């Protein structure tokens, strides 16, 4: 018969091995769960600005570019619900200036960075400031914010009308719908610009429309080339009626663009039977202006 003293080293060895395995399993479990849901850098309700470095600039035209800002870690996401925007801040001429932008990137598949499409205006404060940033320079960002959040099943169909950089929230929603095989939401987008070269993200938009039967895009130009097949001039009530879905309980009309354009579209939408848009849009509104 073995003595208890002879069994003691065996028991100690057993406990040591069990402890090591417990630590390994615990570490693996922590790693799995900590990496299964990427950490969101921004949280709704945050009042403090966070700084992010510019890591890439992709020029789209003579006055527009996509600016890519890096997040603290490659596994991080910005923390932006679909349809929301962020505020950029900079000290310009001794004053703190803020502007809102909708990132074109998405938490769904863009990790470690976020993209913002900005058109630079001669008298623009933030847009000019960002255009002069060098790689490695930081930008102050706060958010997310906004009254619109897209989730699968929100509506059966969208009418979207935008001008210029007003494409950014529409693109974010379109990209999300196109990435989800189960999302069959119908989208009719009317995108207006002055010149053909002003059409932002056209290659990406055309690719989305070509690969998704539920997404249709119609372009409008003020100054159209001779071989142009889209509409010419401003977005009229007739264009809205022809290329957007009729008003209904499962339809929303989304608007984003210059104030005069939005004002005209709100009036035209009422004439077509849509509910009158409120001064500040809410998610439940039939007509939502970003």
Curated annotation (Swiss-Prot):
It is found in: Mitochondrion outer membrane. InterPro entries: CBR-like, Cbr1-like_FAD-bd_dom, FAD-bd_FR_type, Flavoprot_Pyr_Nucl_cyt_Rdtase, FNR_nucleotide-bd, OxRdtase_FAD/NAD-bd, Riboflavin_synthase-like_b-brl. PROSITE patterns: FAD_FR. Pathway: Protein modification; peptidyl-diphthamide biosynthesis. CDD domains: cyt_b5_reduct_like. Residues 47-151 form the FAD-binding FR-type domain. Its EC number is 1.6.2.2. It catalyses: 2 Fe(III)-[cytochrome b5] + NADH = 2 Fe(II)-[cytochrome b5] + NAD(+) + H(+); 2 Fe(3+)-[Dph3] + NADH = 2 Fe(2+)-[Dph3] + NAD(+) + H(+). GO terms for molecular function: cytochrome-b5 reductase activity, acting on NAD(P)H; NADH dehydrogenase activity; transferase activity. GO terms for cellular component: mitochondrial outer membrane; plasma membrane. Its cofactor is FAD. Keywords: FAD, Flavoprotein, Membrane, Mitochondrion, Mitochondrion outer membrane, NAD, Oxidoreductase, Transferase, Transmembrane, Transmembrane helix. The chain crosses the membrane at residues 13-33. PANTHER family: NADH-CYTOCHROME B5 REDUCTASE, NADH-CYTOCHROME B5 REDUCTASE-LIKE. Monomer. Component of the 2-(3-amino-3-carboxypropyl)histidine synthase complex composed of DPH1, DPH2, DPH3 and a NADH-dependent reductase, predominantly CBR1. NADH-dependent reductase for DPH3 and cytochrome b5. Required for the first step of diphthamide biosynthesis, a post-translational modification of histidine which occurs in elongation factor 2. DPH1 and DPH2 transfer a 3-amino-3-carboxypropyl (ACP) group from S-adenosyl-L-methionine (SAM) to a histidine residue, the reaction is assisted by a reduction system comprising DPH3 and a NADH-dependent reductase, predominantly CBR1. By reducing DPH3, also involved in the formation of the tRNA wobble base modification mcm5s 2U (5-methoxycarbonylmethyl-2-thiouridine), mediated by the elongator complex. Belongs to the flavoprotein pyridine nucleotide cytochrome reductase family. This is NADH-cytochrome b5 reductase 1. It comes from Yarrowia lipolytica (strain CLIB 122 / E 150). The lineage of its organism: Eukaryota, Fungi, Dikarya, Ascomycota, Saccharomycotina. The gene is CBR1.
């Amino acid at each position: 018969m073995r003595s208890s003293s002879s069994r003691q080293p065996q028991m100690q060895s057993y406990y040591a091995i069990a402890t090591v395995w417990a630590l390994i399993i615990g570490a693996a479990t922590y790693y799995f769960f900590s990496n299964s849901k990427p950490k969101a850098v921004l949280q709704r309700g945050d009042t403090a600005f966070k700084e992010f470095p510019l890591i890439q600039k992709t020029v789209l035209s003579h006055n527009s570019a996509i600016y890519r800002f890096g997040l603290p870690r490659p596994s991080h996401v910005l923390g932006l619900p679909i349809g929301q925007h962020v505020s950029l801040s900079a000290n310009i001429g001794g004053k703190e200036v803020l502007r809102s932008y909708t990132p074109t990137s998405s938490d769904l598949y863009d990790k470690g960075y976020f993209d913002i499409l900005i058109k630079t205006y001669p008298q623009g404060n933030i847009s000019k400031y960002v255009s002069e940033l060098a790689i490695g320079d930081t930008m102050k960002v706060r958010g997310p914010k906004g009254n619109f959040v897209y989730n699968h099943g929100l509506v059966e169909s969208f009418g979207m009308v935008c001008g210029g950089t007003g494409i950014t929230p529409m693109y974010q929603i379109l990209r999300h719908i196109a990435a989800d095989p189960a999302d069959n939401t119908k989208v009719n987008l009317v995108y207006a610009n002055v010149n053909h070269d002003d059409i932002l993200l056209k290659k990406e938009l055309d690719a989305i429309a070509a690969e998704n039967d539920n997404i249709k895009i119609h372009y409008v130009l003020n100054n159209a080339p001779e071989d142009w097949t889209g509409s010419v001039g401003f977005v009229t009530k007739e264009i809205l009626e022809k290329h957007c879905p009729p008003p209904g309980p499962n339809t929303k009309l989304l608007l984003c663009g210059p104030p005069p354009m939005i004002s005209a579209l709100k009036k035209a939408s009422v004439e077509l039977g849509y509910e009158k848009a409120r001064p500040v849009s809410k998610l439940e509104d039939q007509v939502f202006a970003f």
